[in-house]
């Protein structure tokens, strides 16, 4: 109904105070007899009286609404709550008041609506080989050229008045989602033609999508919520975000929001979940249907005048779908809200609630008008609606040539193509009436007219006083931040485990590092260790926030959705998120820094300590903002993570420790000016050394014969020392070694603060401007080379197909034609007294209770029941897929017990379509056929059978298409067909299980799947299928029914009968009501047994079944089937291989699985190019950062740290491998292990082997990119061993890469999540870093940690790599590295140093110097002597290489063992 004013609103129906009953003291209109009353007095008294009566009336409304009694129909907690009555009362309370603002209503008129995008209906799959070929195309498209226009909507027109509901119908790909997004103003990624006309009640599309965003909303079918928030908090947040400035009844905002939350939860039947987590696919929470209702409730709480709902009933049963539509109807009738709803498989009761319907056919409008007139319109065109088909299904069938039925005599008159349907619509009188109505609407509500002013005033009245006039948000920016802070606190409170785990983990990391540098001495021997420790502390503080990239991407979809709802600015959420992270950052900084600072004996003075804490904290905040800005700047997590490794490497290399400033190459030295870490490191180094003098720990010369030398004849053996002094100035040391000066200390702090502010501003701006990547839509992707074939097929239109009248609808075909060559089944699967018990919280619960039944070849059996009845559980038990609990009873095949080959001889079509995204349809089928078909078939026969399956499932047109992911690859129907095809390709000898094959599909796709199942049964397949509340026509497709009640008890097992008469007769005979004419037997059946929402029964139907003659007949038949054990059977064979667990031998499994994994890597260029960037890119960066390094003391130290930084690549490789393995494992454990496709050993070994192969290639490239630019080959020229030592370096790098691969698999093999394995890798990486001998050699380690040095694989990696690349070569000192002192009188420097150099080595710059000349002494003259400082021996290089291979082997076998120990089921409990 159209509601344009408040005059036709209903009242609450409650009694209001009588105007005659006025409280004492009130003025009256009548006067005393002797009182003289003027006209002005009467006017004044009348005005006061009206005001007070109105106030009493409002108070009455408010008290009735917000203070309703316990059993009031307005109390959402009451069992008698009436949603429609509450809505009327709420309307009166909110809008019918003197100080209230008028309600906002929005209709929408659209004409010449053309929407298009740029792309292609087909694309080719990128691989490592062809990805580079796309670069020119991508560049050309980015510059605006080479784009192919794809039209999505063509000349759509319509009018939806305020308070009306529009039903949008069409199969997937018809443009329904695009239409709803366009109407809601969410056109990101879409292009609306400039000539398109849209009028929102006088408001233009630009105004609606900017100043009034949130007044027209689009709700997608995807559920995006914070999983750890409770349902109550999620909806309370939504209610608060849109709560008006003036609250009726004098309530606080919090009370108002809680009341609305309780009401909306009561409306959608989720009141019981108020304290339950929302959850998601990985976090346990409410059920899928309840989560969908949370999504609906969240959007509804905004009370937007125009609401667009895209398949929001997906996952809901028909009763809840109808209830959803009824709630929208109430909103429309009471508040004048306009709703546009795209709905799949709409029940008739839901369809009847709509005012108008729009039907789209491949983007063409073929009808718009009254919902009750739509069927008649298409019947006039010559189409016939079957008697039991719903109107919505009939309208959708117009878009399918195989489904629509043409009346006799209309064969050559009925339209066939989308264009013909659209043309007939344009010529219809209904369209002319529509155009006239649009013209009238546009005249009454002109753009930028008075309606816009009234709408803006109403919206302004709701917004905060501090909010801008043209802002779409209700709350002020401060209010948004406060609200988001509250939510962040709730998230933290609900799940503090991650935060606490990080705190504890970081604290233990600090303890470990502090123990390595425990109680450093206060002399010069601690110089290197102080620098190394401060470097580690700076990195720990700076990179503590690196995982915030992942955190931001986890919630990005949610933030963008709620920003579109106009709940808050994305920047407000970003600011609140940062503020809420500060306590953790401060606590973490305090724990880590206090532990490291004082345990290691850094400068124990108040001023330096607090300055260090100040620098560490500010640097941590700067880097946190950097990572947050980088995450908000990118569109996908791959874009964020891929370059992050290079960025982190640059930040580490150009800190000033690994490469001192004077050694930085000019082409890259600018990096340090942009690096907050370098400013922080300089500041803390100056803070540690400034103003201090350190006693010298060793002198040159010293030892026997030098005990009595004067102070001028010796010098401290460290950089910055001067002869004649026993102490070294800290300022001189940091200036000589690093080029740092004290005047930079506070300057650096200011720079860090400025960087933090600048990065924060950048982050907040990008959150507002940069949106995440959206799906390209359902685009078929082919292998390069076959894409042109697909494009040609795309050109074929409906006119090339036979006419609709010549194609009998598969839907109504009584006997589909059998497909020649498809495997038929002859064995009967039967079960008796099956029970299933599981332990939940130490209590045994029975899930299945004495279930009987059988499946015979050529029959289609439906398994139905209420949610929680155990339908899927029964399938799992019958298919031997349960891994916990106790199963009792018997499951037999032809009277024989099942053997170990049973699982591979049955097909199980899961509800989730799980496939490897990179394979083609044909490859997926061939993989199943080659590994699961019995060995008696040759490879050629198996592949030939695959082609027959392709034809059977009508997949020939897309047999070479890539599976992809939903949205970019196969659509929902094609994915479901592939799921069924994978099971058929295995030639199941026994039967086929299907779990909810039509769940979430539109009616057309559901019919297509049912046609397929019926075709399979006609080809001799035995099928058991779970299905949830099917339509009447779909239900009639089944032959038999197994109906379960709560607790897994059987209610009925037997024939359904023609028109479900057999089934209905059974219930009527046993006390159930008859099925009304035109009712759906499936829904009626559930109502009879009390399984439908709101239904109730006093009859114990499971007990009725046990006492029925039908049950006795079932028992007799089961007894007969047991006798089949003495007869020949297809499951009995003399071939031992037919009883084996797997059809293919282990070498064949390993070969096929390895080939597929290798193929997956090749077809995932993002992974391999990321690996290349990580390894080769990092190696080039390191190589040229240390380009042709010289063999000075500092130069050698730089090269040692070059190897140390190279270990960073190893750790990053481990992080990269882990999630890829999890993807493979999910598919294997969810489907392929259950169906016995191949063994777990083949799975683990093939994944490790393929990683070995790709990492070998990476090792070759990495070696070339690192070894030669650094110039390490020059060290081997002195011993004429360039080839042998270069080969050894390559072999060590190769072994290192294989170690990274095997270690990653060791970590993830037995662990459930990639996050946990990555956390373990992080801890292990820090341990291996710390104890490899570079930061502190074994002589400097506490005795407790020596074992860690010995068992650390990085120890032998570093030792082997440094000895092979640096060892046994001459070295020299730089000018600032020589130690200068005076020789004794009458002696040359050579004579004076002869004895010392014989023991300590080194060389003199001028051994003949004497007298006033100073001796210039270099402590080392050979690299092997230098390496001994790190306990590295050149002679052990081959031993170190061999030990690396030992680690690789141990890791590999450890991964296999851990997978078996933690992931492989060891057997089931069975009685």
UniProtKB/Swiss-Prot annotation:
Enzymatic reactions: fluconazole(in) + ATP + H2O = fluconazole(out) + ADP + phosphate + H(+); itraconazole(in) + ATP + H2O = itraconazole(out) + ADP + phosphate + H(+)
Gene Ontology cellular component annotations, sorted alphabetically: plasma membrane
TM segment ranges: 498-518, 532-552, 578-598, 607-627, 641-661, 751-771, 1167-1187, 1201-1221, 1252-1272, 1288-1308, 1326-1346, 1441-1461
Membrane topology, record value: Multi-pass membrane protein
Region (Disordered): 1-40, 791-819
Database matches in SMART domains: AAA
Location in or out of the cell: Cell membrane
Listed Polar residues bias regions: 1-19
Top-level lineage group: Eukaryota
Gene3D superfamilies reported in the protein's UniProt record: P-loop containing nucleotide triphosphate hydrolases
Bias (Basic and acidic residues) ranges: 25-40
Single GO term (MF): ABC-type transporter activity
Binding residues for ATP: 865-872
Glycosylated residues, chain numbering: 4, 71, 311, 519, 842, 1386, 1422, 1429
Keywords: ATP-binding, Cell membrane, Glycoprotein, Membrane, Nucleotide-binding, Repeat, Transmembrane, Transmembrane helix, Transport
UniProt-listed PROSITE patterns: ABC_TRANSPORTER_1, ABC_TRANSPORTER_2
Described purpose of this protein according to its UniProt entry: Pleiotropic ABC efflux transporter that shows a strong substrate specificity for the azole class of drugs such as lotrimazole (CLT), fluconazole (FLC), itraconazole (ITC), ketoconazole (KTC), posaconazole (POS), econazole (ECON), metconazole (MET), miconazole (MCZ), prochloraz (PCLZ), and tebuconazole (TEBZ).
Protein family per UniProt: Belongs to the ABC transporter superfamily. ABCG family. PDR (TC 3.A.1.205) subfamily.
Name listed for the protein in its UniProt record: ABC multidrug transporter F
Organism: Aspergillus fumigatus (strain ATCC MYA-4609 / CBS 101355 / FGSC A1100 / Af293) (Neosartorya fumigata)
Lineage: Eukaryota, Fungi, Dikarya, Ascomycota, Pezizomycotina
Gene: abcF
């Amino acid at each position: 109904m159209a509601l344009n004013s408040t005059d036709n609103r209903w009242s609450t129906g409650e009694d209001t105070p009588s105007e005659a009953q006025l409280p004492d003291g009130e003025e009256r209109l009548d006067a005393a007899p002797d009182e003289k009353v003027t006209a002005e007095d009467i006017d004044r008294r009348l005005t006061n009286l009206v005001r007070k009566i109105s106030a009493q009336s409002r108070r009455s409304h408010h008290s009735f609404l917000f203070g309703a009694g316990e059993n009031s129909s307005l109390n959402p907690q009451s069992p008698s709550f009436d949603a429609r009555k509450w809505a009327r009362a709420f309307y009166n309370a909110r809008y019918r008041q003197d100080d209230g603002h008028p309600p906002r209503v929005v209709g929408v008129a659209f004409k010449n609506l053309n929407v298009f995008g740029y792309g292609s209906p087909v694309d080719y799959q990128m691989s490592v080989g062809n990805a580079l070929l796309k670069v020119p195309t991508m560049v050309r498209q980015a510059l605006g050229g080479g784009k192919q226009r794809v039209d999505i909507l063509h000349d759509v027109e319509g009018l939806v008045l305020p308070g009306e509901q529009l039903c949008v119908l069409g199969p997937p790909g018809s443009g329904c989602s695009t239409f709803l997004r366009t109407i809601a103003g969410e056109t990101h990624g879409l292009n609306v033609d400039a000539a398109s006309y849209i009028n929102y009640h006088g408001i233009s599309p630009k105004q609606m999508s900017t100043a009034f965003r949130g007044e027209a909303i689009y709700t997608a079918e995807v559920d995006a919520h914070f999983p750890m928030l409770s349902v109550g908090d999620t909806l309370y947040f939504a209610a608060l975000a849109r709560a008006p400035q003036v609250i009726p009844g004098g309530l606080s905002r919090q009370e108002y929001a809680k009341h609305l939350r309780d009401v909306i939860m009561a409306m959608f039947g989720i009141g019981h979940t108020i304290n339950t987590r929302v959850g998601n696919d990985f976090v346990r929470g409410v059920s899928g249907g309840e989560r969908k209702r949370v999504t609906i409730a969240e959007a509804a709480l905004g009370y937007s005048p125009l609401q667009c709902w895209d398949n929001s009933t997906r996952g809901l049963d028909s009763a809840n779908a109808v209830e959803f539509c009824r709630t929208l109807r109430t909103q429309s009738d009471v508040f004048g809200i306009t709703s546009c709803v795209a709905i799949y498989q709409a029940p008739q009761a839901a369809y009847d609630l709509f005012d108008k319907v729009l039907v789209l056919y491949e983007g063409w409008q073929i009808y718009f008008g009254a919902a009750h007139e739509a069927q008649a319109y298409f019947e006039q065109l010559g189409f016939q609606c079957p008697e039991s088909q719903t109107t919505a299904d009939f309208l959708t069938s117009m878009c399918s040539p195989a489904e629509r039925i043409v009346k006799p005599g209309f064969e050559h008159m009925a339209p066939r193509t989308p264009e013909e349907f659209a043309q007939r619509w344009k010529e219809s009188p209904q369209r002319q009436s529509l155009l006239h109505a649009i013209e009238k609407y546009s005249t009454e509500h002109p753009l930028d007219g008075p309606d816009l002013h009234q709408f803006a005033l109403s919206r302004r009245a709701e917004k905060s006083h501090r909010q801008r006039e043209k802002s779409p948000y209700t709350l002020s920016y401060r209010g948004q931040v406060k609200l988001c802070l509250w939510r962040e606190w709730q998230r933290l409170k609900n799940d503090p485990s991650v935060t606490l785990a990080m705190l504890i983990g970081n604290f233990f990391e600090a303890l470990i590092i502090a123990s390595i540098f425990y109680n450093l001495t206060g002399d010069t021997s601690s110089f290197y260790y102080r620098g190394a420790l401060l470097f580690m502390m700076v990195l720990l503080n700076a990179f503590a926030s690196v995982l915030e990239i992942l955190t931001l991407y986890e919630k990005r979809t949610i933030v963008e959705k709620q920003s579109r709802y106009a709940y808050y600015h994305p920047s407000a959420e970003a600011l609140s998120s940062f503020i809420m992270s500060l306590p953790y950052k401060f606590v973490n900084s305090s724990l880590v820094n206090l532990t490291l600072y004082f345990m290691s004996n850094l400068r124990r003075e108040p001023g330096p300590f607090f300055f260090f804490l100040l620098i560490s904290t500010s640097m941590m905040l700067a880097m946190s903002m950097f990572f947050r800005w980088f995450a908000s700047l990118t569109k996908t997590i791959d874009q964020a993570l891929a370059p992050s490794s290079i960025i982190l490497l640059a930040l580490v290399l150009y800190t000033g420790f690994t490469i001192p400033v004077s050694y930085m190459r000019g082409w890259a030295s600018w990096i340090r000016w942009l690096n907050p870490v370098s400013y922080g490191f300089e500041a803390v180094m100056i803070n540690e050394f400034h103003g201090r003098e350190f006693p010298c720990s060793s002198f040159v010369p010293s030892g026997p014969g030098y005990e009595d030398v004067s102070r001028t004849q010796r010098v401290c053996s460290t950089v910055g020392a001067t002869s004649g002094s026993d102490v070294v100035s800290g300022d001189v040391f940091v200036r000589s070694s690093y080029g740092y000066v004290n005047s930079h200390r506070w300057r650096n702090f200011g720079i860090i603060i400025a960087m933090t502010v600048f990065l924060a501003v950048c982050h907040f701006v990008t959150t507002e401007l940069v949106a995440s990547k959206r799906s390209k839509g359902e685009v078929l992707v082919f292998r390069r080379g076959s894409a042109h074939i697909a494009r040609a097929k795309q050109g074929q239109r409906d006119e090339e197909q036979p006419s609709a009248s010549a194609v009998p609808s598969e839907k109504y075909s009584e006997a589909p034609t059998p497909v020649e060559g498809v495997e038929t089944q002859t064995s009967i699967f039967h079960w008796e007294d099956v029970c299933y018990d599981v332990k939940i919280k130490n209590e045994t619960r029975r899930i299945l209770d004495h279930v009987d039944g059988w499946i015979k070849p050529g029959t289609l059996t439906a398994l139905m029941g209420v949610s929680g009845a155990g339908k899927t559980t029964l399938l799992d038990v019958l298919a031997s897929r349960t891994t916990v609990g106790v199963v009792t009873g018997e499951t037999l095949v032809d009277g024989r017990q099942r053997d170990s080959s049973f699982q591979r001889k049955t097909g199980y079509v899961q509800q989730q379509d799980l496939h490897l995204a990179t394979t083609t349809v044909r490859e997926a089928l061939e993989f199943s056929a080659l590994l699961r078909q019995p060995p008696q078939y040759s490879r050629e026969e198996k592949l030939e059978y695959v082609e027959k399956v392709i034809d059977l499932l009508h997949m020939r047109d897309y047999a070479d298409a890539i599976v992809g992911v939903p949205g970019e690859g196969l659509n929902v129907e094609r994915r479901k067909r592939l799921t069924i095809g994978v099971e058929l390709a295995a030639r199941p000898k026994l039967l086929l299980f299907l779990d909810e094959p039509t769940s979430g599909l539109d009616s057309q796709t559901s019919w297509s799947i049912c046609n397929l199942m019926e075709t399979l049964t006609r080809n001799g397949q035995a099928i058991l299928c779970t299905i949830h509340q099917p339509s009447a026509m779909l239900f009639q497709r089944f032959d038999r029914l197994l109906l379960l009640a709560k607790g897994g008890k059987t209610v009925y097992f037997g024939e359904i009968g023609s028109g479900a008469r057999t089934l209905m007769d059974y219930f009527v005979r046993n006390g159930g009501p008859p099925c009304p004419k035109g009712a759906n037997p499936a829904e009626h059946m559930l109502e009879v047994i009390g399984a439908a929402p709101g239904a109730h029964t006093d009859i114990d139907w499971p007990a009725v079944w046990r006492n029925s003659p039908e049950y006795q007949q079932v028992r007799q038949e089961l007894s007969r089937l047991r006798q089949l054990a003495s007869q020949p059977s297809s499951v009995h064979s003399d071939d031992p291989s037919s009883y084996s667990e797997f059809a293919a031998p282990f070498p064949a499994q390993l070969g096929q699985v390895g080939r597929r994994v290798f193929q997956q890597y090749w077809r995932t260029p993002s992974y391999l190019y990321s690996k290349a960037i990580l390894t080769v890119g990092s190696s080039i960066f390191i190589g040229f950062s240390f380009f042709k390094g010289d063999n000075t003391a500092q130069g050698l130290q730089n090269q040692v740290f070059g190897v140390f930084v190279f270990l960073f690549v190893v750790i990053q490789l481990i992080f990269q491998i882990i999630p890829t393995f999890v993807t493979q494992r999910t598919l294997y454990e969810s489907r392929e292990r259950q169906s016995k496709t191949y063994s777990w050993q083949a799975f683990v070994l093939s994944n490790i082997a393929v990683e070995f192969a790709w990492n070998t290639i990476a090792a070759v490239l990495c070696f070339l990119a690192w070894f030669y630019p650094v110039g390490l080959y020059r060290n081997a020229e002195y011993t004429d061993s360039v080839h042998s030592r270069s080969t050894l370096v390559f072999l060590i790098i190769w072994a290192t890469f294989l170690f990274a691969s095997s270690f990653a698999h060791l970590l993830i093999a037995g662990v459930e999540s990639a996050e946990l394995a990555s956390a373990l890798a992080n801890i292990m990486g820090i341990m291996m870093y710390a104890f490899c001998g570079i930061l502190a050699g074994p002589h400097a380690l506490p005795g407790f940690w020596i074992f860690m040095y010995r068992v650390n694989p990085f120890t032998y990696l570093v030792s082997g790599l440094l000895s092979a690349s640096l060892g046994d070569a001459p070295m020299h000192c730089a000018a600032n590295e020589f130690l200068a002192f005076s020789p004794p009188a009458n002696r040359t420097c050579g004579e004076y140093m002869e004895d010392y150099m014989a023991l300590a080595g080194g060389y003199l710059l001028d051994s003949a110097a004497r007298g006033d000349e100073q001796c210039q002494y270099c402590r080392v003259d050979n690299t092997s002597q230098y390496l001994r400082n790190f306990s590295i021996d050149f002679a052990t290089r081959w031993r170190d290489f061999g030990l690396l291979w030992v680690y690789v082997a141990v890791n590999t076998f450890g991964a296999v063992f851990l997978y078996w120990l933690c992931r492989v089921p060891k057997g089931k409990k069975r009685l």
